[in-house]
Amino acid sequence: MSHAEHATELLPWLRQDYERLVELKNNHKLAHAYLFGGQQGLGKLVLAKHFAHYLLCTNPVSNQPCGECRECQLLASGTHPDLKMIQPEDSSEIKIQQVRDCIHFVSQTSQRGGYKIILIAPAEALNINSANALLKVLEEPSNNTLLILVSHQPTLLMATIRSRCHLMTFNRPAAELVIPWLESKNIRASAAELLRMANNVPLRALHYADEDALHDRAVLHAVLEKLLHGQIDIAEAAGQCEQFTLEDNIEAMMLCASDILARNQISDSTATQTLHDHDLKNLAEFFQDAARLKALHGFYQELLKARRAISSTSNPNRLLVLEGLFFCWSATIR
């Protein structure tokens, strides 16, 4: 199995969450809308897809999709008419027309006679107009319709959206649940070491099996730390990161900020709050008080704005965008 082929497998560390959802369905207690919240790389969307496949399968075996019925065949080909996947398309935003399509989708009768399911990921990509439009779907659920919103930063969602969804929070799993899975992917590096470097985030650990990804990440973390120490200026920082695309720089900074913020969330256990990765731990030491954490949260929002801007038709100056982000990063500890 290649690294890209885990899209609908049941990830071992999510088995209990899956079984909980199946039990709710079997007891006729399934809510009409769920919000899967947690760090990027935990497999939240993988779980959402797997559960959707189970709900649509006409002949599940041991509470798993059979993989052989007509519904499973349609799902495998990505053409099942009763499953709608909403993700950013030509930009980093989920636009209002995509949500309007959802409104039409839920108003129609199921084409295959079962559930109608909408998966939205990442939900924080909803812009203000699409978020407001989604409220209509959440406020007026139709029978046998399920919405699952997947979010890496649930607090960025409108409070009215969060209040209309049943929240399921996902934390980093124990290493013993992940290491055998990583080893099954035929990686060359030590699974335990990759997981340690990824701070117990499984899909990120799999990504780090690519040695270039580890190197690129270390370079950016070093630049971010030097900025906070005042050892380099913004122009120098941008110059050291010019070798990477702006999209990659933004994604790496989002992961970094997300990790530090997650470390300070009460929902994480003491074990998973510990940042094992040396360079990331050094960065986290700068964010020990509420004011700086609030500033870091604001920086994450600036990253989201930048990601939207570079995907728009306005074609901003990419170097200026990167320098602006480094300025915002430096300002988080002022």
Label each residue range with its predicted role:
Residues 104, 136, 159, 163:
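Conserved adenine-binding aromatic site and its adjacent loop/helix in ATP-hydrolyzing domains
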Residues 2-129:
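Clamp-loader machinery-focused feature within the broader ASCE/P-loop NTPase space
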Residues 125-128, 135-139, 240, 244-247:
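Short, surface-exposed loop and linker segments with low hydrophobicity and enrichment for Pro/Ser/Thr
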Residues 98, 118, 122, 126, ...:
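Helical "lid/switch" subdomain of P-loop NTPase nucleotide-binding domains
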Residues 1-53, 71-74, 143-146, 152-334:
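Charged, glycine-rich active-site and insertion segments that engage polyanionic ligands
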Residues 107, 132-149:
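Conserved catalytic/switch belt of AAA+ P-loop NTPases
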